[in-house]
Amino acid sequence: MSISQVIDTSFHEEVINSRQPVLVDFWAPWCGPCRMIASTIDEIAHDYKDKLKVVKVNTDQNPTIATEYGIRSIPTVMIFINGKKVDTVVGAVPKLTLLNTLQKHLKST
């Protein structure tokens, strides 16, 4: 499954209205730690393609949604289920940390 780039105007439709759980990666092109976890996000998108939608939000180009969700540091990864934010992971964390957080919420869906 490919990762969609979501913008301020499409966030509601792509994330809030999604019937699938959604992992949202808030990032920026200049952010070194964002580039460090990019391959992890790609792997998760591939490995969970039947269970999870993965999208990216460029915070430089989409400041409205970044502000709405209180993004102060990037990368920030948020998990949404049924249109509600259920968890947040801030920083370039190990893949296992993201997977454990994700598994915790996917078990309940």
From Swiss-Prot:
InterPro entries given in the database record: Thioredoxin, Thioredoxin-like_sf, Thioredoxin_CS, Thioredoxin_domain
Record site: Contributes to redox potential value: 32-33
Family named by the database record: Belongs to the thioredoxin family.
Superkingdom per UniProt: Eukaryota
UniProt KW keywords: Chloroplast, Disulfide bond, Electron transport, Plastid, Redox-active center, Transport
Function of the protein: Participates in various redox reactions through the reversible oxidation of its active center dithiol to a disulfide and catalyzes dithiol-disulfide exchange reactions.
Domain Thioredoxin: 2-107
Localisation: Plastid, Chloroplast
GO CC annotation terms, alphabetical: chloroplast
Protein name: Thioredoxin
Single GO MF descriptor: protein-disulfide reductase activity
PANTHER family membership: GEO12009P1
Enzyme active site: 31 (nucleophile), 34 (nucleophile)
Residues spanning the membrane: none
Major subcellular site: plastid
Keyword presence, Transport: yes
Site positions for Deprotonates C-terminal active site Cys: 25
